């Protein structure tokens, strides 16, 4: 089986390794190197690094909607193109170029959480289970028929970063156990129930803002879902305060304290009232400063009882 691989971030690396173990990978397509770090030096994406280790040719097109790129894909003579977290929408000419088209490893149990950020929105939505769906790609956004679904639980304190690692490993299992059967026609694709679909929109910075009027459980889910980017944040004295770690302190009423009020700020605990219940902030970072334990923020008088966050 000859295969092309489309992917960019770390979550896609295990799938590339798995594909290389069962197929002749004739090319890897990933996004271009991007400036990163304080020096803004160009950094290769994780998939490119792994592809070069495997000795596979890498292509990093700035644009995928060109006749030249479609011709390159067609000329590769691939039986299938496997896509996971590539980060670009592929045109029809590319989708149809391989003999069996393009198949996608999507990080949700389709048709739920179609779109660019399924891991984050599943956690924010309080889901207790997610998975990897192997699907045939069409011109829609994750709308094609599904060959296989593998499921995994989401723990009550699991963060988006942690879940991405789990799903990366699960996707590799799908590649090893299900991809060839899908390509060979042994797995029948099942159409999705489009009426049951939900959307996982591309994240914006504002999506990270904590809405203190929500319940403690909802805010906790929001914080752990936003860990990678943009981060869950509120404001204090006009500056952004990124909440890096927290847990539900109580689901009971906080004596009428307005949502966002710091109701307790001791040596080892900072508790903030929510619309229902309260959360304990464990670790946070004031804009322009290093991350600190909440107790250190209290000691430095950054957080004090009676303050109202998010004003």
Curated annotation (Swiss-Prot):
An example molecular function term from Gene Ontology annotations: methionyl-tRNA formyltransferase activity
EC supergroup of this enzyme: transferase
Catalyzed reactions: L-methionyl-tRNA(fMet) + (6R)-10-formyltetrahydrofolate = N-formyl-L-methionyl-tRNA(fMet) + (6S)-5,6,7,8-tetrahydrofolate + H(+)
Binding site for (6S)-5,6,7,8-tetrahydrofolate: 108-111
UniProt key word ATP-binding: no
InterPro entries per UniProt: Fmt (IPR005794), Formyl_trans_C (IPR005793), Formyl_transf_N (IPR002376), Formyl_transf_N_sf (IPR036477), Formyl_transferase-like_C_sf (IPR011034), GART_AS (IPR001555), Met-tRNA-FMT_C (IPR044135), Met-tRNA-FMT_N (IPR041711)
GO CC annotation terms, alphabetical: cytosol
Keyword terms, alphabetized: Protein biosynthesis, Transferase
Pfam families with a match to the protein in the record: Formyl_trans_C, Formyl_trans_N
Protein EC: 2.1.2.9
NCBIfam families the record matches: fmt (TIGR00460)
PANTHER family for the chain: METHIONYL-TRNA FORMYLTRANSFERASE, METHIONYL-TRNA FORMYLTRANSFERASE, MITOCHONDRIAL
Family that this chain belongs to: Belongs to the Fmt family.
Biological role: Attaches a formyl group to the free amino group of methionyl-tRNA(fMet). The formyl group appears to play a dual role in the initiator identity of N-formylmethionyl-tRNA by promoting its recognition by IF2 and preventing the misappropriation of this tRNA by the elongation apparatus.
Protein name (Swiss-Prot/TrEMBL): Methionyl-tRNA formyltransferase
């Amino acid at each position: 089986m000859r295969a092309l691989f489309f992917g960019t971030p770390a979550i896609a690396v295990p799938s590339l390794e798995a594909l290389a173990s069962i197929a002749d990978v004739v090319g890897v397509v990933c996004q271009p190197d991007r400036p990163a770090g304080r020096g803004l030096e160009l950094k290769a994406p994780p998939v490119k690094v792994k592809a070069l280790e495997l000795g596979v040719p890498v292509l990093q097109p700035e644009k995928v909607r060109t006749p030249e790129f479609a011709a390159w894909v067609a000329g590769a003579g691939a039986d299938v193109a496997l896509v996971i977290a590539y980060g670009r929408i592929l045109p029809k000419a590319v989708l149809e170029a391989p003999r069996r088209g393009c198949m996608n490893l999507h990080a949700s149990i389709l048709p739920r959480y179609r779109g660019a950020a399924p891991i984050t929105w599943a956690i924010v939505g309080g889901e207790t289970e997610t998975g990897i769906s192997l699907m045939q790609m069409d011109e829609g956004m994750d709308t094609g028929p599904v060959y296989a679904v593998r499921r995994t639980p989401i723990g009550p304190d699991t963060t988006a970063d942690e879940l991405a690692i789990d799903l990366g490993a699960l996707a590799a299992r799908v590649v090893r156990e299900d991809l060839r059967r899908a390509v060979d026609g042994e797995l029948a694709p099942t159409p999705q129930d489009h009426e049951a679909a939900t959307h996982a929109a591309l994240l914006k910075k504002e999506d990270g803002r904590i809405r203190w009027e929500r319940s403690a459980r909802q805010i906790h889910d929001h914080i752990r879902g936003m860990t990678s980017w943009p981060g869950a944040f509120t404001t204090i004295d006009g500056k952004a305060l990124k909440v890096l770690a927290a847990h539900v302190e109580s689901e009971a009423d906080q004596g009428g304290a307005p949502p966002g009020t710091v109701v307790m700020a001791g040596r080892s605990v900072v508790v903030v009232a929510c619309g229902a219940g309260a959360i304990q902030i464990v670790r946070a970072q004031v804009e322009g400063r290093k991350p600190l334990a909440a107790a250190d923020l209290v000691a430095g008088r950054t957080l004090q009882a009676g303050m109202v966050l998010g004003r």
